[in-house]
Amino acid sequence: MINVFPVRAFRDNYIWIVHNQQFALIIDPGDATPVLTWLRQQKLQPIAILCTHHHHDHTGGISLLVQKFEIPVYGPASEKIPGMTHPLAEGDTLVFPELSLELSILDVPGHTAGHIACHGQNRLFCGDTLFACGCGRIFEGNAQQMFDSLQKLTDLPDETQVYCAHEYTLDNIRFARAIDPDNPELIELESNVEEKREQNMPTLPSSLAAEKATNPFLRCNQPAIIQSASRYAGRQLTDPVSVFAAIRDWKNNFRGNTDLPM
């Protein structure tokens, strides 16, 4: 049996450790220090590093970890990942016998040009593509790419557990409620998340079913989202990609409920 543990780093990063009683897979190690501390405390042997994209807060700890453990580094083939030994692209499958774990690789460009996600055993490690109630900023791709990447993730089973790389949930919910204020599942989620954050507990993993019900970026064909996006854009939007682009731009500039278009 494997477990997934969130090692916290920086202000709001989660470095996910997939492990059993002996071995560990390290996902997106932006900082080696908290990872080393946790591995030592748990007496675990790391077997590999897996990175979803090249941003430093996901890769900054690789060099020290590789220096200490001499383990392989997996990452997107089209991005410069420090020390990468195994470049990956959609269609590749990773097998870690020590963990009885198999992961399928998906290309999910948008946040970065070569961003990948990994799915296996009803777990999705999606880096900065999909967040709980949100999605990543579009730095290197375009709205169409990001929309397509998110739609690809929605094709996974509803019971999939979503392990994103940042604790953005509460801020994302506040934006989602500005767009979709009457969504009862969103209102309930906000209450549950506020309670967890008051106790300094992670709000992750989410589930794909929950995201489909509450995440505006996955619901761009829904009337409430279309209406709010059109009000923000100042014109009637008729296709989901335009709706997505509008609410992504809105989120980039969102400062609170006072931003709700009149």
UniProtKB/Swiss-Prot annotation:
Gene3D superfamilies recorded: Ribonuclease Z/Hydroxyacylglutathione hydrolase-like
Residues that coordinate or bind Zn(2+) 1: 53, 55, 111, 128
GO biological process, one term: methylglyoxal catabolic process to D-lactate via S-lactoyl-glutathione
InterPro entries the UniProt entry points to: Clx_II_MBL (IPR035680), Glyoxalase_II_hydrolase (IPR050110), HAGH_C (IPR032282), Hydroxyacylglutathione_Hdrlase (IPR017782), Metallo-B-lactamas (IPR001279), RibonucZ/Hydroxyglut_hydro (IPR036866)
Binding site for Zn(2+) 2: 57-58, 128, 166
Cofactor binding, per record: Binds 2 Zn(2+) ions per subunit.
Cofactor: Zn(2+)
Superkingdom, natural source: Bacteria
GO molecular function: hydroxyacylglutathione hydrolase activity; metal ion binding
Catalyzed reactions per annotation: an S-(2-hydroxyacyl)glutathione + H2O = a 2-hydroxy carboxylate + glutathione + H(+)
CDD domains noted in UniProt: hydroxyacylglutathione_hydrolase_MBL-fold
Record-listed E.C. numbers: 3.1.2.6
Enzyme class, spelled out: hydrolase
Keywords for the protein's UniProt record, in alphabetical order: Hydrolase, Metal-binding, Zinc
Protein's pathway: Secondary metabolite metabolism; methylglyoxal degradation; (R)-lactate from methylglyoxal: step 2/2
Pfam families in alphabetical order: HAGH_C, Lactamase_B
Family indicated by similarity: Belongs to the metallo-beta-lactamase superfamily. Glyoxalase II family.
Quaternary structure, from the entry: Monomer.
Described purpose of this protein according to its UniProt entry: Thiolesterase that catalyzes the hydrolysis of S-D-lactoyl-glutathione to form glutathione and D-lactic acid.
This protein's name: Hydroxyacylglutathione hydrolase
